């Protein structure tokens, strides 16, 4: 289903060691610049409907920290969109109350995705902070009791790489609908924290995830960015099946590049300000950028010195759009083999 990813804010109540976003960590309720204005949200939804988009993926920051979170859900539901959102589960009872406050909000909720980065409290809390593991597990149990579809998203790094089997088992125990594993994108911060696995280990991670896919009843998958022998882009942002709107109301190429932690200024991936122009106008600019990226990838695919990089497409985009100056990971992109 074509969907729009919308960043509600650029604020979070955790300070996770692996986070790749440049985000305000702490209380910022009075800083309006960090929250998507609701009139901009409604404008985007009105303009996206005739283009065939019917679902909103709400991200952040921590989306429920938007001071008008419930009103934002009313706008989404009222415009006929289904939605889901990603959360770290902090203050989840308040979040659940907001979701359930109006019948249409609850009816249009397709599910809630939870960030869970360890099969044990020790591992998860080492990455995300004290008590966060219990908050996530409790929140998922609350969703199950209320009939809300819950999913788990895990970023694999050195701290939790050994827990893939246990994480899948935990997902089954918690009766989640789906479970997604993804690689850790590099930043100066998480490279400095020694969290990034060597690129040569990524294939082993993918094999472990592929193995657990067949051993459990719930849906287990790898997030886009895993090893591929198909050199030309086929991810949802580069086919326009996923649009990404940042918290400033701007159309960007991809959520994985948006507000990147090492970036000190806007890059070419920011294509249009939807406060000032229509979604159709900005989407035309995005199409031009996507066509440019396709041509660049084609040139790389026929260049023996460059084509090996294309096995990991997300890393290619991180390099292409200058999102990090962290060289060790980018150097490893040449010469990747099965």
Language model feature labels by segment:
Residues 1-111, 324-330, 334-338:
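Conserved alpha-helical substructure of the radical SAM core
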Residues 6, 10-13, 229, 308-311:
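Processing junctions and N-termini across compartments
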Residues 12, 16-19, 235, 254-255, ...:
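Short cysteine clusters
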Residues 15, 19, 95, 122-123, ...:
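Residues that scaffold the ATP/ADP-binding catalytic core of kinase and kinase-like folds
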Residues 105-111, 115-277, 281:
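Radical SAM enzyme [4Fe-4S]-AdoMet core and its adjacent flexible, acidic
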């Amino acid at each position: 289903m074509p969907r729009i990813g919308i960043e509600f804010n650029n604020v979070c109540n955790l300070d996770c060691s692996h986070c790749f976003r440049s985000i305000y960590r702490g209380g910022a309720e009075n800083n309006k610049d960090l929250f998507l204005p609701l009139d901009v949200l409604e404008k985007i939804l009105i303009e996206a409907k005739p283009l065939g988009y019917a679902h909103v993926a709400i991200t952040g920051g921590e989306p429920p920290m938007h001071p008008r979170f419930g009103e934002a859900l009313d706008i989404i539901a009222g415009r006929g969109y289904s939605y889901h959102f990603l959360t770290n589960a902090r203050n989840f009872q308040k979040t659940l109350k907001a979701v359930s406050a109006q019948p249409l909000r609850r009816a249009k909720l397709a599910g809630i995705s939870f960030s869970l980065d360890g099969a044990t409290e020790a591992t998860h809390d080492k990455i995300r902070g004290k008590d966060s593991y219990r908050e996530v597990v409790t929140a998922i149990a609350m969703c199950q009791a209320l009939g809300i579809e819950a999913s788990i998203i895990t970023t694999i790094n050195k701290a939790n790489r050994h827990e893939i089997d246990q994480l899948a088992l935990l997902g089954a125990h918690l009766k989640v609908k789906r479970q997604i594993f993804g690689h850790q994108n590099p930043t100066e911060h998480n490279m400095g924290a020694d969290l990034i696995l060597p690129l040569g280990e990524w294939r082993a991670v993918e094999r472990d995830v592929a193995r657990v896919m067949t051993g459990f009843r719930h849906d287990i998958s790898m997030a886009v960015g895993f090893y591929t022998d198909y050199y030309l882009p086929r991810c949802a942002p580069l086919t326009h099946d996923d649009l990404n709107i940042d918290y400033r109301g701007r159309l960007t190429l991809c959520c994985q590049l948006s507000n990147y932690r090492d970036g000190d200024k806007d890059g070419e991936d920011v294509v249009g300000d939807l406060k000032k122009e229509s979604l159709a106008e900005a989407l035309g600019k995005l199409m031009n950028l996507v066509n440019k990226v396709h041509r660049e990838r084609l040139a790389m695919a026929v260049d023996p010195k460059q084509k090996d990089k294309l096995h990991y497409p997300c890393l290619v985009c991180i390099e292409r759009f200058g999102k990090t100056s962290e060289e060790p990971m980018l150097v490893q992109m040449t010469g990747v083999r099965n």
